[in-house]
């Protein structure tokens, strides 16, 4: 079975382990097209050729780079004519121009098509995106949703085709694993890891909650963005500047080592009218490293963590503080949550598991399965 995937996300080296895992299914002949760079608001994301065994990774230019709704691959028609895939996996939202154009061009070579969506809030888009969305939902063969809320959104918006709930990427458990040992005398180390430092990630709440902790502790904050100056100012105002380290953007290759130094990882996301946490990938990466995780009850966070971590109400500084205090004072609690977290990742969130479920979708598409159920992890 020939599968062609379009994915700007697969620029990231660690994400490419999913592609290798798909390619390990011997019946799949996989080709993936990525751009050389994506101009994200947080900064340019350049292609990392980190995991490229078993499949073809092609690099094609895109037009309107950085424009989420209007970018597209101008060479796709030629690629489709040359490869003639059985399945075109469009790793993109259904209301974007890239998806609409890819679907239209795939029909020329009779390829089955699927889209991927994280969209966990119902939004109504202006013309022409509402028209693009309507046509994609009517003509696409399959939908993969990154979370249960996205599945519900697209059913509400009229998508009647088959779908599955499968996270976009899992974790390579061989890369993200516990450190050989943690120095018990180094004090309690807390971490926050977001690519962008923006208000909805709740890092200010974490600073305030941590400032109440007694004893010896440190806080590492990964990421960069418009809120960094105000967060640095807040750390000074709280009198904890010497305990807080702003580490900037941590690359995917650096992330395993970054997480392994932590005792606890916090994702303090807060829901906004136009956004709520779609998944929280850093949670499963930390869990794989046997780091205790603490998350706000925003969006998908509670479903990702399950019983393998601690949950607190959004914006509840004292609840977050008490979770951190309990973790700080109990190595047993940290160890138990760490072990439970890694086991949860091994059961549900490895790249191998995600790849297996994705390949099963490809087979359903080719076999013209009529299954229209929603399944969750």
Place the predicted regions along the sequence by residue.
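Conserved donor-binding/catalytic core segment of Leloir-type glycosyltransferases
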Residues: 4, 182-211, 220
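A short, histidine- and acid-enriched strand-loop-helix "catalytic/donor-clamping" loop
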Residues: 8-11, 95-97, 105, 109-127, ...
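Donor nucleotide-sugar binding/catalytic pocket of nucleotide-sugar-dependent glycosyltransferases
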Residues: 34, 138-178, 185, 193, ...
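A short, well-ordered alpha-helix in the C-terminal region of glycosyltransferases
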Residues: 319, 326, 333-348, 357-360, ...
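Short hydrophobic beta-strand element within catalytic cores of glycosyltransferases
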Residues: 285-295
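Nucleotide-activated donor-binding/catalytic signature segment of Leloir-type glycosyltransferases, i.e.
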Residues: 232-253, 264
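Conserved acidic donor-binding segment of nucleotide-sugar-dependent glycosyltransferases
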Residues: 102, 307-318, 326-332
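Nucleotide-sugar-dependent
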Residues: 197, 267-284, 302-303
């Amino acid at each position: 079975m020939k599968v062609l995937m379009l994915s700007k996300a697969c620029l990231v080296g660690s994400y490419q382990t999913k592609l290798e895992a798909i390619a390990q299914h011997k019946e799949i002949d996989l080709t993936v097209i990525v751009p050389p760079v994506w101009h994200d608001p947080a900064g340019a994301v350049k292609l990392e050729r980190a995991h490229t065994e078993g499949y073809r990774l092609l690099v094609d230019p895109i037009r309107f780079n950085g424009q989420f709704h209007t970018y597209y691959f101008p060479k796709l028609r030629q690629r489709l004519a040359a490869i003639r895939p059985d399945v075109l996996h469009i790793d993109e939202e259904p209301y974007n121009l890239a998806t609409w154009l890819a679907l239209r061009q795939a029909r020329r070579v009779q390829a089955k098509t699927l889209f991927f969506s994280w969209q966990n809030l119902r939004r109504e888009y202006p013309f022409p995106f509402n028209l693009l969305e309507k046509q994609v939902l009517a003509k696409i063969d399959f939908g993969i949703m990154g979370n249960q809320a996205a599945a519900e959104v697209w059913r509400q918006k009229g998508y009647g085709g088959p779908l599955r709930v499968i996270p976009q990427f899992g974790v390579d458990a061989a890369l993200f694993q516990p450190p050989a040992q943690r120095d018990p005398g180094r004090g309690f180390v807390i971490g926050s890891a977001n690519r962008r430092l923006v208000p909805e990630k709740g890092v200010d709440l974490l600073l305030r909650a941590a400032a109440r902790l007694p004893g010896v502790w440190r806080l590492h904050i990964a990421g960069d963005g418009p809120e960094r100056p105000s967060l640095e100012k807040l750390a000074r105002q709280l009198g904890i500047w010497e305990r807080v380290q702003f580490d900037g953007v941590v690359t995917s290759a650096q992330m395993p080592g970054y997480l392994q130094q932590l005792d606890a990882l916090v994702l303090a996301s807060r829901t906004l009218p136009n956004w709520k946490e779609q998944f929280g990938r850093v949670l499963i990466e930390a869990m794989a490293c046997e780091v205790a995780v603490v998350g706000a009850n925003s969006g998908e966070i509670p479903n990702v963590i399950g019983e393998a971590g601690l949950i607190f109400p959004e914006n509840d500084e004292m609840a977050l503080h008490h979770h951190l205090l309990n973790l700080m004072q109990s190595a047993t609690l940290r160890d138990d949550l760490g072990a439970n977290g890694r086991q949860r990742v091994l059961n549900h969130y490895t790249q191998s598991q995600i790849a297996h479920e994705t390949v099963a979708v490809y087979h359903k598409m080719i076999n013209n399965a009529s299954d229209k159920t929603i399944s969750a992890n």
